[in-house]
Amino acid sequence: MKVAISGGGTGGHVYPALAFIRELKKVHPEAEFLYIGTEKGLEAGIVKREGIPFESIEITGFKRSLSLENIKTVMRFLSGAKKSKQILREFKPDVVIGTGGYVCGPVVYAAAKLKIPTLIHEQNSIAGLTNKFLSRYTDKVAICFEEVSDSFASEKIVFTGNPRASEVVGVDGEGALEAYGLVSGKPTVLVFGGSRGARGINEAVEAILPEWNKRDFQLLYVTGDVHFEKIKDSLGEMNLGNHISVQPFIYDMPKILNAVTLVVSRAGATTLAELTALGVPSILIPSPYVTANHQEYNARALEKNNAAVVITESELKETDLMATVDAILTDEAKLNSMKLSAKQMGRPDAALKLVETVLSIMK
């Protein structure tokens, strides 16, 4: 069996692809894979480190308004589709999967024109431009949020969830908090703003640290590498208690997520898939800097189901974040209700469901 996969630009498109590959290998250990991405996207480094064969094409995204740059983008798309056809003819895959990002546009389009079975995976609650375009040509569209179903033909939709969810379920969180100087068994809040951190979240947390110092529950505050030294210096005279741990980055996030009580974070699709798979309540602060404001749409889907509280970044300064945390952690009924709601939204079997869907279109 040969499988070609394309997706990139951000980790949110790459990590679901890798989770799918790992799951398919369990069922078909003999399967061969080829990843098609760009050299400029995150996928180049991540995929190569995984030891997966990698081919690259050149492509940029369409602007959401009329632009001369879009003419160049069309030319790059056609060139990318031509190169993709060459790559696919040589590799001869049984199926081609797109996990989002501009790069999968020419790849999946080329595969469809070559009559190769195709599937695209939409991680967000609002469809990306590339996936909207590709859905006309693909055999199936795998989705993670019911809210996005109106963007695609109903007969093509399969609700699989995000395969990254499957990778956090069953991970042992024992000892995870101790590695960061905290204690197991105590209510613990994890705050993080993504791999690079988020200035808005950092500023809000710094403002309430004196109050947090008076609380019994623990805080694992992940600043992001870029912000760590500056924040560490500013906290030098605050005399934080042992129940507060400030870190630049967390490398064992699946273990940590299995050990914490509440999460304060952005609302990227991968993060939400992990939180719901584990039934972890959250306070979500969507990034305002993403395409089509898709993180807020993602967050509102959880809020609507009582799995999260949403605070937009523009509301952060007027919102008492400490009071929001207190309201959840000091109300056991509310906390348990949010846990249950998050768990009900989760798809811990997402990777297997996606594998089954892919295998079905190959028959």
UniProtKB/Swiss-Prot annotation:
CDD domains: GT28_MurG. It is found in: Cell membrane. Its main location: membrane. It catalyses: di-trans,octa-cis-undecaprenyl diphospho-N-acetyl-alpha-D-muramoyl-L-alanyl-D-glutamyl-meso-2,6-diaminopimeloyl-D-alanyl-D-alanine + UDP-N-acetyl-alpha-D-glucosamine = di-trans,octa-cis-undecaprenyl diphospho-[N-acetyl-alpha-D-glucosaminyl-(1->4)]-N-acetyl-alpha-D-muramoyl-L-alanyl-D-glutamyl-meso-2,6-diaminopimeloyl-D-alanyl-D-alanine + UDP + H(+). GO terms for molecular function: UDP-N-acetyl-D-glucosamine:N-acetylmuramoyl-L-alanyl-D-glutamyl-meso-2,6-diaminopimelyl-D-alanyl-D-alanine-diphosphoundecaprenol 4-beta-N-acetylglucosaminlytransferase activity; undecaprenyldiphospho-muramoylpentapeptide beta-N-acetylglucosaminyltransferase activity. UDP-N-acetyl-alpha-D-glucosamine binds at T10, G11, G12, N124, S195, I250, Q295. One of its GO terms (biological process) is carbohydrate metabolic process. Pathway: Cell wall biogenesis; peptidoglycan biosynthesis. Keywords: Cell cycle, Cell division, Cell membrane, Cell shape, Cell wall biogenesis/degradation, Glycosyltransferase, Membrane, Peptidoglycan synthesis, Transferase. Transmembrane segments: none annotated. Coiled coil: none annotated. It comes from the Bacteria. Belongs to the glycosyltransferase 28 family. MurG subfamily. Cell wall formation. Catalyzes the transfer of a GlcNAc subunit on undecaprenyl-pyrophosphoryl-MurNAc-pentapeptide (lipid intermediate I) to form undecaprenyl-pyrophosphoryl-MurNAc-(pentapeptide)GlcNAc (lipid intermediate II). HAMAP family: MurG. This is UDP-N-acetylglucosamine--N-acetylmuramyl-(pentapeptide) pyrophosphoryl-undecaprenol N-acetylglucosamine transferase. The gene is murG.
